Structures are given as structure tokens and as C-alpha cells.
Amino acid sequence: MKLVEIAEDILSKANAYTNNTGLTSSQRFQLREEIRYQANGILSAIDGPEQTMKAIARSYTTCTALKVCVDLKLASHLPLSDARSLSQLAQICGCDSLVLRPMLRLLAKNGIFEQVDAETWQHTELSAVMAQPPFQALEEKYRSVAHLPRLLQAVSHQFPTPGRTAFNQVYCTSLDFYTYSNELDHAAARNFAFSMKELARNQIPFVQQSYPLETIDPESHFIDVAGGVGYLSFFLAGSFPKATFEVQDHPFIIEEAHSVCPSELRDRITFRAHNILHPQPEIAKEINGRLVFLVKIILHDHGDDDCRLMLRNLVSVMKQGDRILIIDTVIPETGGSLSSANSDIIIMSMFGSGHRTLEEFRALIHRCGEDLVIETFASGDEEYDGMMVIEVRKAEPVLDN
């Protein structure tokens, strides 16, 4: 397709996307992906395939410039509503202006920071995002992904295994990221935990749209497995005013969780230090409601063996009527979002695991050695990056005639 034809097609789709006339969430997602794909097609049409491939191959330089500016906390040192000279920024950041200048020049080509004149720089909408918590949790991901090609060469391009990942080599440890950060790098653990707030907030509409929450006993006891500081439980507590919650995670994160729990929820939410690979603690005798185990964005960070162990630990304490709600990305057999494709590489680098298809999830759950019933809920899956809610229950006993 010629350049003008691509541009005209994008304009037509952009108008449909902006006007949102009668589009379902799935159609909006598909339209967005087509616009993004064709926008890249414009660059290819302008530069030609050889130059386009060179630009893609050199994109690691943009990541490097971004990482340097994150290390310097540049986004925080530059006021959102004002501009600063290069020399001022270099002095505030404690770096050489000759180091900072090429970083800013390259990022500005991507809309990250803006050069006002020969000496002065200011924020853009993109660069302002760098001051937010999720961007403070990129250190381990950046270093691990950068090391992945070398690791794969060393293992003859076989899939990495837990304990022998790019993260493990970079940080000279056999511990997984969560154990390592909670035991040895509390700043990393804290940054990661607090970066999950917006993710949890954005997932609540998806859960409400996709899963019939009204089928849950209003006096249920929710157990938020590896739940970080408890953001998902905080949000769900508003929908279940009679329910109780227990948030489980590593000891350091649980200490942090106490400080951020809303005061009005402290009589209904408890926190427990617990390793998800260990058997579930005994349920308190005063807990009479149905159990609902929340497993949100957990399984994709673990290999099949560990996932089966986690699920068996949950199933072993379940009774009829209890349920597990797995909230995770489920990749399609073809296609899928750019976001999930990116995170698949990150997960391989960090954990030696990856996203799963629905059939892979089903096989994983059924190999837990129990007679389990699986239902999937995904009415908004494409809009929410392929997310699904997978409900797991014990099968009803078959009565003899």
C-alpha cells in the first residue's frame, strides 16, 4: 500500500475510533491495533525496509537514554510547568552536561522531553510519566532483558529455567526477583509493590465487566494470594462491605501493607506473611464464609511446576462452594497486543516463564490432580490486553442412584 493510501486509511480508522459510533470494546481494541500497525507502516514506507530495520535494531539506544534519565531522576528535577537549561539540569542531576545532552536529544525524537531553544528543555506529556512509580520499577527489567541474548546463547537457545534466568545471572543470585528484592533489596521491593496500585485500579472495571461478582457470597472470606500491599482487596472491599480479606505476601511487603491500608478497612482486612509455594495456613475457626482465593497476575511469573504447587496448596483447603479466581493475561493463538508481546520477553528474562494460551491454562489446572471445574470470563478481554478471569471450583460430588 502506498504512503498516501496508508495515511488515508489511518485517517478513516482514526475518525471511527474517535467518534466511537456503535463500536464494541473488542472492535475498538482491534481498530486501535490496526492504526498502530499502519502508523508503523508509514515509517516503513518513508524510510524503506533496510533503514526501518536499522532503526528497530538501534532502538536499544533509546532504552539506554531512558534508563540513564531515570537513574538521574531527571523527570523529578524538571518542573512540570517550567523549563530549565541543560547546564541547570546537569548541575541538579550531578552529571556532565555532555552526557545529558545526547540523552535528551534522542528522547526528544520520540516525544520524550522537548527542546525549547538551543539551551532550554521542558517536559512533554510522555516525559511527565517518568516521575510516576511504575517507572521507578524498571531497573531489574531493563538489566535482565538486555542480558537475555547472552543467556540464550549460553544455553543453546533453550527456554530459561527458574533460578537460571537472565535476572539470576545479572544479579548473581539463585533467588527469584520477589525473594531477592524482599530479602536483599527493599527499595526494589517497595517500588514494585507500589507500582501495582494503578494496575489494580485499572483491573477493577475489567473484573466488574467480565465476572459475575453477584455470584459470590457477600460474606465471603477473600484471600489475596501474593497480593502485594493489598490494592485489589482494598478496591473489592467497597463492593463487598460484609466480606473479610486476608492479604498474603513476603514479610517486608506485609510490613509496608499495614501503612497503606485505609483506616476504614482495617477491621476487615488482615495481613499475613506467607510464601505461595508453602501450604496454605489453617483457616481461622471464626471464618464461616465461602473462601475466594484471588490469584492476580501471579501465574505468568512462574513455571508450570511452581504453578501446580501453588494451585494444589489452594485446592487442598477448599470446600464445595469455594473458588479460585485467576486474573491473568491469556494470549491468543494468533495476534495479541503489543503490550503482552513486550511483557512476554520481560517475563522470560526475569522469571524463566511466560504468558499462556487458554488451552495451556486449562492443561495446567487439570494437572493439579483434582476433579476441578473451570469457567472462563472475558467479555472485555481484548480491551484489557487479553485479560481473563478463570474460575476454578471443586466439582460437585456425583450421587449414586
From Swiss-Prot:
Among the GO molecular function terms of this UniProt record, one is:
protein dimerization activity
What EC number(s) are associated with this protein in UniProt?
Answer: 2.1.1.-
Top-level EC class, please? Answer: transferase
Classification via SUPFAM superfamilies = S-adenosyl-L-methionine-dependent methyltransferases, Winged helix' DNA-binding domain
Binding-site list for S-adenosyl-L-methionine: D249
Known Pfam families for this protein? Dimerisation, Methyltransf_2
Q: For this UniProt entry, which residues form the secretion signal?
A: none
Q: Which InterPro entries match?
A: COMT-like, O_MeTrfase_dom, Plant_O-MeTrfase_dimerisation, SAM-dependent_MTases_sf, WH-like_DNA-bd_sf, WH_DNA-bd_sf
Residues annotated as the enzyme's active site: H300 (proton acceptor)
What family is it from?
Answer: Belongs to the class I-like SAM-binding methyltransferase superfamily. Cation-independent O-methyltransferase family.
Q: What is this protein called?
A: O-methyltransferase SAT18
Q: Which organism is it from?
A: Stachybotrys chartarum (strain CBS 109288 / IBT 7711)
